[in-house]
A protein has these predicted regions:
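Amphipathic regulatory helices of Ca2+-sensor modules
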Residues: 27-45, 75-90, 113-127, 149-163
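Acidic/histidine-enriched, glycine/proline-rich intrinsically disordered or flexible terminal extensions
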Residues: 159-179
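General zinc-binding finger modules coordinated by cysteine/histidine
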Residues: 86, 92-94, 101
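The feature marks the first
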Residues: 2-41
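Short helix-capping and inter-helix turn/linker motifs at the boundaries of alpha-helical repeat units
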Residues: 2-6, 55-56, 93-94, 126-128
Length: 179
């Protein structure tokens, strides 16, 4: 299956955000730095939720290295990243775990909802731009208390990594992403 141009744009943005040191490659240290930043974004979240999210970042990085690091250099190029991340059979389990853990992190009360402040804090910690974050949250259809369902966000994260998807809420994250 050929990925949509929107899916390719989404994955290229994720690569740039995860490349924490800006050296053009993803390495275990990049995932550790990202994990630390995101876990710190919602201090009210419980330790078990924080640990789950940190573990999902480790699995995400470990999956990439296991699947792609053919030469054993401990790092992933943009081309290698695109080839596996847009392949649900090879990367789907890591995306599922990450989606569930990140969405749960935004629900420190455990009521099944993510309020805008927690959503924005987590997405800023990942490195997305605030206007894109706000547009995404609005696209998820917040309720009268300005909250979205945890399941809605988790499903949106899964869709973000689906190669056949276009015109999804997650596409708001790539609009003028480099501006």
């Amino acid at each position: 299956m050929t990925p949509t141009s929107e899916a390719t744009d989404r994955v290229q943005l994720v690569f740039t955000l995860f490349d924490a040191d800006g050296n053009g490659f993803l390495e275990p240290a990049d995932f550790k730095l990202m994990s630390d930043r995101v876990v710190a974004a919602v201090p009210a979240a419980g330790d078990a939720v924080k640990d789950r999210l940190a573990a999902s970042f480790r699995r995400y990085g470990d999956t990439l290295l296991t699947e792609l690091d053919a030469n054993g250099d401990g790092r992933i190029s943009p081309e290698e990243f695109d080839s596996v991340v847009l392949n649900p059979q090879r990367f789907g389990a890591a995306v599922d775990e990450f989606a569930e853990a990140l969405a749960a992190m935004g629900d420190p009360e455990g009521d099944g909802f993510v309020a805008r402040p927690e959503f924005v804090a987590l997405m800023l910690a990942i490195g997305f731009r605030r206007p894109n974050i706000e547009a995404l949250f609005d696209a998820f259809g917040p309720d009268g208390d300005d909250r979205i369902r945890v399941a809605t966000w988790a499903d949106g994260i899964r869709d973000f990594y689906r190669p056949e998807k276009s015109g999804i809420p997650g596409d708001h994250l790539t609009a003028n992403a480099s501006a």
